[in-house]
Amino acid sequence: MKKLLLGLSLLLAIAIFAVSCSKDDNGNDVVLPGKANSFLTASFKGSKNVKLSKVNDNLTKKEFEVILDNGIKIEFDKDGNWVEIEAVKDVGTIPSEFVPKDILDYVTEHYLGLGINSIEIEDDGYEIELTDGTDLDFDLDGVFIKVDK
């Protein structure tokens, strides 16, 4: 009788576990903050979300990730502010409108012929990745700090 009761308990536990894990988090129920939606609508007219997911990365403050059909990936914080914009899928470069003018001028002057593959805003400034893989750090005012290897 003990074995039967133990067996039924184990079977019930497995059934409950299977039901609770059956719904994968595929992003369909993820809702972006209004500010993020407004940003996407204004900045990427005509592009569609290919993938939307919730990231919850406390270290980098990234909460949401959107990949657009044009190959641009945008990561947002919990309030809907973009924290990283990156060109994926061999797109090459991100639109320059997201890069502060001083940073864009520096890259144009010192890295002729290279584009910006990604920009990430951090608490103390910006990190830029060029199309050749070089990482550059700038302060919040767009002043060059260093090449980050």
Put a short name on every predicted segment:
Residues L6-I14:
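Sec-dependent N-terminal signal peptides
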Residues S22-D25:
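Bacterial signal peptide processing site
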Residues F17-S20:
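C-terminal motif of bacterial Sec signal peptides marking the signal peptidase cleavage site
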Residues M1-L4:
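Positively charged n-region of N-terminal signal peptides that target proteins for export
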